[in-house]
Each structure stands twice: as C-alpha cells, then as structure tokens.
Amino acid sequence: MGKLTLLLLALLGWLQYSLWLGKNGVHDYVRVNDDVAVQQGSNAKLKARNDQLFAEIDDLNGGQEAIEERARNELSMIKPGETFYRLVPDQSRRNAASSSQNNLQK
C-alpha cells in the first residue's frame, strides 16, 4: 500500500509541475493571452484605418463632392462664379503681440 501511495504522489507531483511550470502550462497560457490582447488592439486600429480608407475610396469613386472638396483643399480651386475669400489676422494685433513679446524678452 505504501508503494502505491508513493507512486500516486509522484504522479500527482509530476502532473502539477507540468500544469504550472511545464510547456503549455499556466505561465505560457497567460503570456499567450497577453499577446493576443495586444494583437487584437493593433488589429482594431488597423481595421478602423482600413474602414476609413475604404470610405474615402467609395467617395472618390462615386461622388463629385469628395472630388470638389479635395480640389478646394489641396489645389485651392474654386467653381466658376464663386468668390474666394482669405481671412488674414489683423496687422495691428500682430504688431501688438510681437511688441509685447519683445518687451517681455528685455
């Protein structure tokens, strides 16, 4: 009876060692779960970026509005009959700001 108990205890010890410290044990499971969580976050960011790019492609393929918006913003184009206005900061405010900075530096 004593030999059987020792054999079962040794088997139990070996199984516990395999479970906690062996290959594919709890430590590996936790590490892999952390890696999966990091990768899922990265995948979510990339999926959002891809969705945005696909939406932009759909706009460019199907709509004039996206083409007009891009021409206005990137090429500074205007439609016939439109008036282009450029808003510039007030010169007196800019001079006052620069003179106050000069006074602070002295």
Swiss-Prot record:
Per the record, its GO cellular-component terms are: cell division site; cell septum; plasma membrane
Q: According to the lineage, what is the superkingdom?
A: Bacteria
Coiled-coil features, chain-numbered ranges: 40-62
Task: State where the protein is found.
Answer: Cell inner membrane
- List the stretches on the Periplasmic face of the membrane: 22-106
The UniProt entry lists the main location of this chain as membrane
Q: What is the lineage of its organism?
A: Bacteria, Pseudomonadati, Pseudomonadota, Gammaproteobacteria, Enterobacterales
- SUBUNIT field: Part of a complex composed of FtsB, FtsL and FtsQ.
Gene3D superfamilies found in the cross-reference section: 1.20.5.400
Protein name, per record: Cell division protein FtsB
Q: What is the originating organism of this protein?
A: Serratia proteamaculans (strain 568)
Q: Which residues lie on this side of the membrane: Cytoplasmic?
A: 1-3
